[in-house]
């Protein structure tokens, strides 16, 4: 069983607000921001939603995967969703007791403060860290970053789209230099960059789970961009390593495609990964589908 407290892990108070006090779009936005500012509930609900969606695909539609890979936290989701790891309850207990998302890579972001050698009085009244999606080629962004500090290339989505993160002013200066389309994204933790490397042991501890099954599925990891062994120590190390460096989703998609995959089903929110997969593969033979569209009722979705 995935969990004895699935309702708690889903955090329905954020995903499915039913309170009579939510009367306006503005109040809904405030609740959404509260969710963004709660990394542990976001982590747990994201994984739990993927687990449930995967069970529906397998049990209701009879769809079984030959390969699996994830985008950032999606690598954790795939291991629970396909039964490599068992119950999430022990991990939830470790996660919520850990300083990792409370103060190290979220909240006051002390790992960043230490890495940048900030004073206690620095960034008390302004944002320390922001994320931005850029419509720009990864190579151009990486080149521009060579002479900059406090801003990092954290994710490569496609050959034309990346994600940067860091001190807001440094990010905006980079965007101004590149003269590219950009969008701020509501992420409130620090991952996939050097300031996180000091947290390797704690990240590994949080993600150390007993392997309870080894399905006949090729599991790909962003740690080495190849298939991984289903070993508790190796899986935790994979995740702890890629938390501290850029994740190249484009490279991961290419590796999975070269392994023979042609049909891709995105189990995450907004079908973003489905879009990125298609952008990466272009005119090559493939089908990329997402199960979730923002603000679209599943019952009313005419694709089902």
Positions of PLM-derived features:
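Conserved small/polar residues in nucleotide/adenosyl-binding loops
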Residues: 295-302
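Acyltransferase
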Residues: 25-267, 272-273
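Short, acidic/turn-prone active-site loops that include or flank metal/cofactor-
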Residues: 187-188, 291-294
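Active-site machinery of serine-nucleophile hydrolases
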Residues: 1-30
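Structural alpha-beta junctions
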Residues: 3, 180-181, 283-288
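Short acidic, glycine/proline-enriched helix-loop-strand junctions
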Residues: 274-291
């Amino acid at each position: 069983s995935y969990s004895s407290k699935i309702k708690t892990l889903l955090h329905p108070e954020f995903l499915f607000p039913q309170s009579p006090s939510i009367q306006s779009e503005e109040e809904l936005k405030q609740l959404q921001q509260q969710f963004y500012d709660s990394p542990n509930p976001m982590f747990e609900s994201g994984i739990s939603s993927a687990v449930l969606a995967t069970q529906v695909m397998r049990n209701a539609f009879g769809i079984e995967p030959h390969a699996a890979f994830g985008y950032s936290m999606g690598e954790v989701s795939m291991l629970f969703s396909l039964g490599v790891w068992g119950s999430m309850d022990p991990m939830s207990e470790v996660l919520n007791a850990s300083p990792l998302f409370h103060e190290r890579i979220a909240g006051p972001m002390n790992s960043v403060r230490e890495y940048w050698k900030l004073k206690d009085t620095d960034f008390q009244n302004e944002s320390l860290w922001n994320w931005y999606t850029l419509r720009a080629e990864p190579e151009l962004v990486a080149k521009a970053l060579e002479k900059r500090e406090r801003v990092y290339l954290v994710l490569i989505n496609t050959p034309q789209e990346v994600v940067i993160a860091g001190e807001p002013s440094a990010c905006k200066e980079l965007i101004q230099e590149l003269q590219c389309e950009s969008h701020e994204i509501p992420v409130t933790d620090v991952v996939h960059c050097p300031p996180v490397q000091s947290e390797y042991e704690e990240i590994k501890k949080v993600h150390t789970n007993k392997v309870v099954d080894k399905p006949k599925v090729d599991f790909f990891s962003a740690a080495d961009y190849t298939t991984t062994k289903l070993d508790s120590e190796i899986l935790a190390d994979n995740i702890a390593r890629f938390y501290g460096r850029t994740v190249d989703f484009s490279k991961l998609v290419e590796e999975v495609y070269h392994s023979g995959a042609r049909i891709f089903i995105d189990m995450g929110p907004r079908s973003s990964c489905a879009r990125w997969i298609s952008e990466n593969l272009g005119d090559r033979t493939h089908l990329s589908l997402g199960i979730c569209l923002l603000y679209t009722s599943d019952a009313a979705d005419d694709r089902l």
